[in-house]
């Protein structure tokens, strides 16, 4: 059975897409069959981080009735990229019916995948909540800043109230060290659990690094760089492995691959 995992965030600029791309690539290089759905429709940029020229996107499923197989782009590592489309205004305001069509279109890939990673739109929009809740598990990326905490809380609250999603995992990005990352996580967990009946799980952390910024400019995933700092190699590996083992969370609404 394919496991679907949403990578989400309460706000943009916290490293969500970078984490989604690098973890998807890492899992692929370890022998798993992985697809990355860039669900940040209309503003998708996973293909840029992967240096992949795209021909078709999710928009072509909706507008041209293309099969999902014609939208999947193979990358050199074996990762299957499903681009969300960039600069397509129609994709910015998809209604629930079109979101359902996209989710159901991936059913055709269920025998070809082990893991689906979904890079969701930042924030607590209807699209972000629905695509996140359609996954078996949700990972929220936050940074040690009050605004990140506030926006991540708003997203988790929407996910809980609208979709009965009662468990999320957290990755702390741009942390000074492991101790600081866990302190940020503990502080955020206290805020969430004080007001919401949501289980929290610390999935891992990443330090601030010029290598990450450089990999984005170079259009090459950081985990493929031989010169990547050992701490980043270690932490990306741990987060990716934790993603593969993350427990399924029950929620209401439509699910990828009809998983319940």
Show which residues each predicted segment covers:
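Conserved catalytic-core segment of NTP-binding enzymes
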Residues: 115, 121-204
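Short, well-ordered alpha-helices that flank and scaffold nucleotide-derived cofactor binding pockets
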Residues: 21, 25-29, 133, 157, ...
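NTP-binding/hydrolysis catalytic cores, primarily Walker-type P-loop NTPases
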Residues: 217-260
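Beta-strand-loop-alpha "switch" segments that mediate conformational coupling across diverse proteins
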Residues: 195-223, 236
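Walker A/P-loop phosphate-binding motif and the immediately C-terminal alpha-helix
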Residues: 2-40
């Amino acid at each position: 059975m394919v496991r679907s995992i949403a990578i989400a965030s309460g706000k943009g600029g916290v490293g969500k897409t970078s984490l989604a791309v690098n973890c998807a690539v890492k899992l692929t290089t370890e022998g798993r069959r992985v697809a990355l759905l860039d669900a940040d429709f209309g503003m998708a940029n996973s293909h840029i981080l992967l240096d992949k020229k795209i021909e078709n996107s999710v928009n072509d499923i909706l507008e041209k009735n293309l099969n999902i197989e014609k939208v999947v782009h193979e990358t050199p590592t074996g990762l299957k990229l499903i681009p969300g489309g960039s600069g397509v205004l129609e994709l910015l305001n998809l209604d629930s019916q079109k979101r359902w069509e996209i989710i159901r279109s991936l059913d055709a890939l269920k025998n070809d995948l082990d893991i689906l990673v979904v890079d969701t739109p930042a924030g607590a929009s209807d699209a972000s909540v629905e695509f996140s809740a359609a996954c078996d598990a949700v990972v929220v990326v936050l940074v040690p800043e009050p605004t990140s905490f506030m926006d991540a809380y708003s997203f988790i609250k929407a996910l809980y109230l609208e979709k009965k999603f009662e468990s999320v995992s957290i990755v702390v990005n741009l942390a000074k060290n492991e101790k600081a990352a866990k302190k940020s996580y503990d502080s955020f967990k206290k805020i969430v659990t004080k007001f919401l009946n949501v289980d929290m799980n610390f999935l891992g952390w990443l330090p601030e690094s010029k290598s990450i910024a450089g990999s984005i400019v170079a259009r090459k995933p950081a985990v493929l760089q031989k010169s990547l700092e050992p701490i980043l190699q270690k932490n990306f590996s741990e987060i990716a492995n934790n993603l593969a083992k993350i427990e399924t969370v029950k929620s209401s609404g439509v699910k990828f691959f009809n998983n319940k």
